Amino acid sequence: MRTGHVALAIATLMTTTTLPAIAEDSGHWHGLGVLTVANETTIKVEDRANHVVRVLDEDGAIYNADGAPFLNKARYQVAAIIDSGVTGNGYKTFTDADGSKAFAKFTVTESKPPELKGTFQFTGGTGKYTGITGNGTFNLVRLSDKVAWDELVGDYKIPTAVAGTANKN
């Protein structure tokens, strides 16, 4: 008789719970940031007049303009390659206070100095940003040779594991 009760309890437990499910944290993001040039290398290319390639290492901070917790008050780093205003691309790294990181790659689509416009795409992350995807646009304005502000607008999705939930049936 006791075996029957144990079997019934196990069967009930198995039908009222599920394995971890995948949920998703998603939203719209409006980030405002400031960057300073930490390191810059300029390389002259002699194939045409005034052709230079710049490699920039920038460091700064970004906050969520809507006050939401996503990438709010985070460190903001950029590694960029700019080819005489013809092309520009690189990588953005956002680091939250808890150490979680979100990574993005970007491409400049319009260059009218001191303003650069382009697109970015989240490529992954660590900690709470593991598996992040999404994309958006940016508008960067150089205030001097060492300082810029950047406005980013886009959407993101972050998969999150949800512990076994009770079956409501």
Residue ranges and their predicted role:
Residues A7-T18:
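Bacterial N-terminal signal peptides
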